[in-house]
């Protein structure tokens, strides 16, 4: 058995840009996706192992929904892709997902992306 520290390195293509949500391989689910984007007061959870496309999928959805009249905020650790027109909060040693989510809820958000929900407090607020 090995002991000690581990490191994870993620390499993202910097010049790739954000992919169109409908080019990601969900052809049968396109109408379901469009309907889910129109729902108010709902939560969508995307869960998958590392490297399975969660970030690509989430940013594609945000890009699809990103319009000046929609207040979109992300809470991430770290912010992986900077997106014009979206408010992005990066978690650090002085902030948490829960405290940031509480703050964002007071700012009349239309859409909130919470990058991780790993504790009961964040789960209850979401």
Each PLM stretch: what is its role?
Residues 53:
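Conserved glycine(s) of the Walker
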Residues 56-57:
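Conserved Walker
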Residues 1-48, 60-73, 84-87, 91:
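P-loop NTP-binding catalytic core
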Residues 61-64, 94, 104-107, 116:
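Amphipathic alpha-helical segments that mediate coupling or scaffolding at interfaces
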Residues 75-78, 105-126:
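Conserved P-loop NTPase nucleotide-binding/switch module
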Residues 88-104:
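Short glycine-rich substrate-engagement loop in P-loop NTPases that contacts/grips substrate
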Residues 33, 62, 101, 123-126:
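Generic hydrophobic/aromatic pocket-lining and core-packing "Φ" positions
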Residues 81:
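Flexible, glycine-rich phosphate/dinucleotide-binding loops
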């Amino acid at each position: 058995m090995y002991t000690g520290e581990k490191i994870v390195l993620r390499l993202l293509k910097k010049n790739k840009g954000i992919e169109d949500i409908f080019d990601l391989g969900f052809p049968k689910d396109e109408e379901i996706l469009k309907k889910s984007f129109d729902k108010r007061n709902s939560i969508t959870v995307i869960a998958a192992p590392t490297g399975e496309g969660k970030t690509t999928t989430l940013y594609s959805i945000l890009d699809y929904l990103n319009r000046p009249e929609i207040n979109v905020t992300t809470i991430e650790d770290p912010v992986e892709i900077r997106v014009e027109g979206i408010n992005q909060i990066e978690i650090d040693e002085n902030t948490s997902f829960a405290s940031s989510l509480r703050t964002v809820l007071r700012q009349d958000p239309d859409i909130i992306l919470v990058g991780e929900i790993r504790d009961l407090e964040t789960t209850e607020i979401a």
